[in-house]
């Protein structure tokens, strides 16, 4: 359960910001905590802070134990062991990162037919809501994001819905949300069984294979994948690198992956191609990595485009070793050395400031650069192969003929 939220939203420099707020959460204690002191539990479960920090927070009431509906006083907590049915109550000062503002506050506040919270509605009935997600905002609460997420914004407008699949924060496009668990389960089952045809659009570097064969007109986008001679298939495995986790856990196993690509239009002035992407499997960053390995990365991809990447060591590894387990020269020690390079370059990109919140002493983060909150990758079409539904969005501006 969560209480104490008083949310103040404002916009600044193209960003939607939430002022820091207090949030109180409560939950029953875990079985492994029984018979232990609260201070010992906090130190062992949350190792980022020293013991002295948690002692101070207990005295301030940040952490409380509720027993039989009555909170125990701080001094009592220092000597009382945790019992079954106790409730741990935690009060935190939340600092949410800003997101890209997709519309004015006035438009966000006023819902109209075909629009909710400033998001364009593609389709809606009693079971599902389909919207055109803007880039730069997470779909659901994750990490530091909570209020600045699509599902929480929809709740403020009277719609409690579950996302049926994942779209990254910086990816735009078609998002299907279910209004009940049964509808969510049915759609997710279709995706898992590959009964769902998904087509994305990406704007990539260079002249993509077979793009010389396409007709440069608006109708070209409507005939994707019809001519098999224009299809490029990438089948290299996909794995993830998570520098926030230690090696070897932060380097996942390689998994088979398939993506089909089809050129839609070529912008000769920019030497860039708009490509339709059909992922057959659903690995994390699959389309972005496959395009990078083909030598045609997404134009503004700050991770996988070599021209602008902030993570050159990670990109070099992923493109050089499609299946890292097959490389005999990559023993455990060499992998550990390389992984440390991934960690170092991630730390170098951390946008921290030298100011601290006076209330909770959290280090302030710099505002993100607006261009870092947009990726020219767009979920364009979703179609259930048995004909239950077929949805698509308008073309994003960067894919339109007059946006060369």
Each model region followed by its residue ranges:
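RNA pseudouridine synthases
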Residues: 1-404
């Amino acid at each position: 359960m969560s209480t104490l939220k008083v949310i103040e939203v404002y916009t600044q420099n193209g960003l939607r910001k939430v002022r820091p707020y207090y949030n109180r959460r409560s939950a029953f204690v875990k079985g492994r905590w029984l018979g232990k002191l609260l201070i010992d539990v906090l130190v062992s479960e949350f190792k980022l802070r020293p013991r002295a920090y948690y002692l101070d927070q207990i005295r301030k009431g940040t952490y409380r134990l509720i027993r039989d509906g009555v909170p125990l006083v701080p001094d009592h907590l220092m000597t009382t062991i945790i019992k079954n049915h106790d409730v741990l109550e935690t009060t935190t000062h939340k600092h949410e990162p800003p997101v890209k503002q997709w519309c004015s506050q006035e438009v966000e506040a006023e819902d109209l037919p075909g629009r909710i919270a400033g998001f364009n509605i593609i389709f809606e009935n009693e079971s599902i809501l389909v919207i055109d997600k803007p880039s730069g905002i997470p779909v659901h609460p994750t990490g530091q994001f909570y209020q600045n997420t699509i599902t929480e914004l929809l709740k403020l407008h009277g719609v409690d819905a579950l996302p049926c699949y994942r779209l990254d924060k910086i990816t735009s496009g078609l998002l299907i949300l279910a209004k009940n668990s049964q509808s969510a389960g049915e759609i997710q089952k279709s995706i898992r069984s590959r009964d769902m045809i998904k087509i994305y659009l990406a704007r990539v570097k260079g002249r993509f294979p077979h793009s010389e064969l396409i007709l440069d007109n608006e109708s070209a986008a409507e005939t994707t994948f019809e001519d098999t001679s224009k299809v490029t298939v990438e089948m290299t495995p996909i794995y993830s690198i998570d520098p926030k986790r230690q090696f070897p856990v932060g380097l996942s196993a390689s998994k088979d992956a398939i993506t089909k690509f089809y050129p839609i239009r070529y912008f000769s002035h920019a030497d860039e191609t708009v490509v339709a992407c059909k992922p057959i499997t659903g690995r994390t960053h699959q389309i972005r990595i496959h395009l990078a390995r083909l030598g045609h990365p997404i134009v503004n991809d700050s991770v996988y485009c070599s021209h602008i990447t902030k993570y050159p060591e990670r990109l070099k590894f992923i493109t050089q070793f499609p299946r890292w387990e097959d490389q005999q020269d990559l023993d455990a020690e060499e992998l550990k050395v390389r992984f440390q390079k991934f960690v170092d370059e991630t730390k170098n990109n951390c946008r921290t400031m030298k100011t601290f919140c006076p209330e909770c002493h959290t280090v302030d983060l710099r505002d993100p650069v607006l261009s870092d909150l947009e990726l020219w990758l767009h979920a364009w079409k979703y179609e259930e192969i048995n004909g239950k539904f077929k949805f698509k969005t308008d073309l994003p501006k960067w894919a339109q003929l007059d946006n060369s």
